[in-house]
């Protein structure tokens, strides 16, 4: 998805894209690490989850700089793994499908860049 120049955005909708993408990444990653915890997450449901995650990331990309800004604001307010994942995905020059990510590298980046918790 390419940003649409000079097209007004709806900030609340873009915020929802950021929140849902962060949440869906967290669900996806947790499932891959602990598949036994949710036996109902079969291949079809996992595929739907991936489609939704990609759609929310696309919604942020279409919003261009506003999408990046809003995702950054969500991360500033909630510095969690999902929010950092979204910010990082939006930094790429071209969209990278989540399926093509090296999950070990992605997890390592997140672990190394999340702020320390008290």
Residue ranges, per PLM feature:
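N-terminal alpha-helical scaffold/docking segments in eukaryotic complex subunits
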Residues: 1-117
């Amino acid at each position: 998805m390419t940003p649409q120049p000079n097209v007004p955005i709806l900030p609340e909708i873009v915020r929802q894209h950021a929140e849902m993408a962060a949440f869906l990444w967290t669900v996806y990653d947790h499932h891959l690490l602990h598949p036994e915890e949710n036996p109902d997450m079969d291949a079809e449901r996992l595929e739907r989850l991936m489609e939704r995650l990609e759609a929310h990331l696309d919604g942020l990309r279409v919003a261009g700089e506003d999408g990046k800004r809003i995702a950054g604001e969500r991360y500033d307010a909630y510095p969690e793994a999902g929010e950092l994942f979204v910010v990082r995905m939006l930094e790429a020059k071209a969209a990278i499908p989540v399926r093509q990510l090296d999950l070990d590298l992605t997890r390592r980046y997140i672990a190394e860049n999340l702020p320390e918790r008290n």
